[in-house]
Amino acid sequence: MTEFFSGNRGEWSEPYALFKLLADGQLYLGDSQLNKLGIVMPILSILRQEKNYESSYILHNNSQNIIVTYNNEKFTVPISGFQEKAVLLLSEIKNASGNRAFSIPSIDDFLKKLGFTHLSASSSSKSDIHIVVHDLRTGITPTLGFSIKSQLGSPATLLNASKATNFTFKIYNLKDKQIEYINSLSGIKEKIKEIFSQDGKLEFVKVESCKFSNNLTLIDTKLPEILAEMILLYYSSKLNKIDDVTEHISRLNPLNYNLSCNHNYYEYKVKHFLNDVALGMRPDDVWLGQYDATGGYLVVKEDGELLCYHIYSKNSFEDYLYCNTKFDTPSSSRHDFGHIYQVNHDFFIKLNVQIRFL
């Protein structure tokens, strides 16, 4: 019995992106609102890692063929073939629903001919494909790694939640009976709002994980406090978009920065944080400030068009992350947070968030 490749909409978006790139022959840079900037980088070749070997796709001058090499195999495929398969893939992805896995038998032989061993890259890597481009502004031909983010599937996660991303807060001004009642409430946001409605106070104590705390401090010494303020605002209000939460915190200015000259302290630091998460920083690992081998993100838009965001255009990349992400509440039981607990005579609560794309 023949086994077909199977994946959800996000996983199928990876071969779609490859075929679309080979058909277009160039990368389009995008702005924060997912519009083309008018800056184009011609593609020279694309590299994709399979299980035991690397496949390369070379766009040769003005040829209408792509040179494909992998595992001692070398052959050409007409660009029109990638165009046709990209159209087919996009239609099948759009017709799928939910996050279920599905197969596309009509494209299976083409994938196997190209040496595909899987649809999507390993989750341990931040880069899904590597692209050699001709940067017309500098004249150089760098190899850039890209993570593919698809709007055709479920929203991707930028910062994954874990116990390492718990933030601990101390509770003041509440009596035992009040604590008991608040703990009986089911929703975490409901608990936080009730703490404040009963004149309670929450004070940030620490980031639960020493590694994550140090990673944040490496980015900016005040970043743990800034994120703690943002997390509190998220759980005590209807705000969830990163840019909205940051702007609100900026107006409150809880860290008492000197704003007399209109410096965007909070926005600058949050953008730096998002950039570093996107390019290598993981909460569970010691991070030394070195970016992963990635150039940035390739975004598959809902209409199938591709936009590129990379560290060569750092401002556009950070603006994209800032304007297209939001806080989300992860599983409290899995990550052990959202319950008031007592240590000696003091009460504490841990709060946790993950950051998703819109």
Curated annotation (Swiss-Prot):
User: EC number(s) in its UniProt entry?
Assistant: 3.1.21.4
- GO BP: any one term: DNA restriction-modification system
Q: What class of enzyme is it?
A: hydrolase
Query: Single GO molecular-function term?
Result: type II site-specific deoxyribonuclease activity
Q: Name one Pfam family in it.
A: RE_HpaII
Does rRNA-binding count among this protein's keywords? Answer: no
Catalyses:
Endonucleolytic cleavage of DNA to give specific double-stranded fragments with terminal 5'-phosphates
Keywords annotated in UniProt = Endonuclease, Hydrolase, Nuclease, Restriction system
Q: Does the keyword Nuclease apply?
A: yes
State whether it acts alone or in a complex, and with which partners, per the record: Homodimer.
Task: Please identify the protein, giving its name as recorded.
Answer: Type II restriction enzyme HpaII
- Give the species this sequence originates from: Haemophilus parainfluenzae
Which gene name belongs to this protein? hpaIIR
